[in-house]
Amino acid sequence: ATPGSAAQSVADEMVRAGLLHLDLITYGLEPNGTLIPTIGDYTAIGSESAPIIQFMDSMGWHDTARRAIGFFLDKQHDDGFMQNFNGYMLETGAVLWTMGEHYRYTHDDAWLRDVKPRMLKACRYLQAWRARNQNGAKGDGFGLLDGKTADPDDPFRSFMLNGYAYLGLSRVAEMLAASDPAEAKLWRDEADALKRDLRESFIRGVERAPVVPLGDGSWAPAPAPWTGYRGPVMLHADGGAWFTHGTMTGRDSLLGPLYLVFQ
């Protein structure tokens, strides 16, 4: 074998081994029961289970992915909210995104008809949440969702939380475009409005952010992970206690504006 083909073989084996590892920690009753796509030694989370389920779909395990999505729909709250772990507030948008990716792979219209009522209930929950925060001047969090996105108790209008919400609403509009154009337009308009509010808040954050040096000698503004704070929280520009999980950089590197790439 050539060096290139050997490397490709190793990569292929690693990918397939990863899939089997995830299969080992996905629990449920065969042949058709709901599956729980756990995160190692703790339960499924809409955000952290999303790449697991989407990886399964990308490898052709569409039935497994569908049953794993079912976990979040089975446990959905009566008001449409989805939450399974440690008070995390971002699962609803992340699950809607994963549903959209599943539909992109499968175009399973029978499944879409089955999940549509619960999917729309989740959308209406996000819509009402957004409406509660449409107060004050545009920018600095207007119309954005507020709540914690990970282990730290940060109940702010974060870009991670809202990036997932936008992506979820956008995927719902995409899924319904052919079968229910009127409903699709409603959620496309809602997603686009959230995107505009997100961009205005992000630009406001960039305007007030300090600049930091880059590797090529240039400087760039470094915004905060949420609205209303000046720059990366690890710089303590506006004070606060930000040490968590053995690092000062966790919030800025893992929970911040990088999720706006979804737009």
Q: What is each residue range found by the language model?
A:
Residues 2-113, 157, 236-263:
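Substrate-binding groove/exosite segments of carbohydrate-active enzymes
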Residues 12, 62, 66, 109, ...:
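Non-membrane alpha-helical structural segments and their capping/turn regions in soluble enzymes
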Residues 18-30, 60-81, 115-137, 190-209, ...:
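Long, well-ordered core segments of solenoidal/helical folds
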Residues 38, 72, 76, 85, ...:
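Solvent-exposed, non-transmembrane amphipathic alpha-helical segments
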Residues 52, 69, 73, 99, ...:
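General N-terminal targeting signals
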Residues 131-138, 142-146, 154-157, 164-263:
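Catalytic cores of carbohydrate-active enzymes
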